[in-house]
UniProtKB/Swiss-Prot annotation:
Gene that this sequence comes from: rps18
Annotated protein name in UniProt: Small ribosomal subunit protein bS18c
Domain of life: Eukaryota
Cysteine disulfide links: none
NCBIfam families noted in UniProt: S18
GO cellular component: chloroplast; mitochondrial small ribosomal subunit
Organism of this sequence: Trieres chinensis
Subunit relationships: Part of the 30S ribosomal subunit.
Length: 72
């Protein structure tokens, strides 16, 4: 059985996750605008919930796009 290496979270445990911090939220979405899963980012369950809620709020307020634009 192989031991999996735990990924380091890009945010600290005590760091406040805010919907206005677009630079932080962009670390947790793909180029297509999808929210990255917890196993890919290495955050805790509580942090993942806060991140998802903040991204959804930022989308509603037009701070983040719902989907990426297709620029050819």
């Amino acid at each position: 059985m192989l031991a999996q290496k735990q990924k380091l979270s890009p945010i600290s445990v005590n760091q406040k996750i805010d919907y206005k911090d677009i630079d932080l939220l962009k670390l947790f979405i793909t180029e297509q605008g999808k929210i990255l899963p917890r196993r890919a980012t290495g955050v805790t369950v509580q942090q993942q919930r806060q991140i998802a809620k903040a991204i959804k709020r930022a989308r509603v307020l037009s701070l983040l796009p719902f989907v990426a634009s297709n620029s050819i």
